[in-house]
Amino acid sequence: MGILLALLPAIAWGNILLVSVKMGGGAYSQTVGMTIGALFFATIMYVFTQPALTMTILIVGFISGLFWALGQVNQLKTVEKLGVSTTVTISTGMQLVATSIFGVIAFREWTTTTTIILGTIAILLIVVGVVFTSLDDKENAQPPGQLKKGLLTLIVSTFGYLVYVIIIRWYNIDGWSAILPQAVGMFVGAVVLTSKHKPFNKYAIRNALSGLLWGTGNLFLLLSLPRVGVATSFPLSQTGIVISTFGAIVFLGEKKTKRQLIFIALGSVLIIGGAVLLGMTKA
């Protein structure tokens, strides 16, 4: 039962970008719509769980949500440039590397020879995986400069996601307590970042569904942690990239050559393998 719970976040999160693209709209309306759904879900969860909310939790959770919005809107902007299958694998790899390196520097996570070796191998696997998934073929190449623009946008996205995760951990805030203030920050951040682009339209409403998926994944992650631990739940939650990557090719019709498909598959395996090793360093 615990393993099943730990897999559910991957299923939910792995479908977010697929659903978002299917619902239509641009990155701005998609981001706002996602936060509407997430805020609705978080409000319901707060009513049922009613965790204690101190001023620190409210402020830090809100700031965390603001940076999530920065990460999400830039990830969706990258999807418009590179497509879901390429964006999600590179984005996942960048996030894993960034959070791991920051964890070592700020929280001194890798303190033994074993964890240092495992962590180093994990990062190397993830980096190679990212390179594999971003390879182009001449017959299916990105327009000149498109990949570079996408990668630069993803760096901004990764920074947003990094602060979103790290600040909660820095202040040692429980996930249940953070849900509502984070969701409020996500919504406010999305509105501020997209206000010039008139994001409130029918596509924003449709994309509330992707926000509900995000909330569902978050819920199952919190439920699985006490049952299977971080070392198991963390890598399992990252396997959603398989759903996103190949779902985009199958259901969204993203065109890839045979060579690209092989390298995307290899890259996904390497990134997941790296995530598993990172999970072992957290054991």
From Swiss-Prot:
GO terms for cellular component: plasma membrane. The chain crosses the membrane at residues 4-21, 26-48, 52-71, 84-106, 110-132, 151-173, 178-195, 208-230, 234-253, 260-279. InterPro entries: Sugar_transport. It holds the Pfam family Sugar_transport. It is found in: Cell membrane. It comes from Bacillus anthracis. Keywords: Cell membrane, Membrane, Sugar transport, Transmembrane, Transmembrane helix, Transport. Gene3D superfamilies: 1.10.3730.20. Belongs to the GRP transporter (TC 2.A.7.5) family. This is Putative sugar uptake protein BA_0200/GBAA_0200/BAS0200. It is a multi-pass membrane protein. One of its GO terms (molecular function) is carbohydrate transmembrane transporter activity. It comes from the Bacteria.
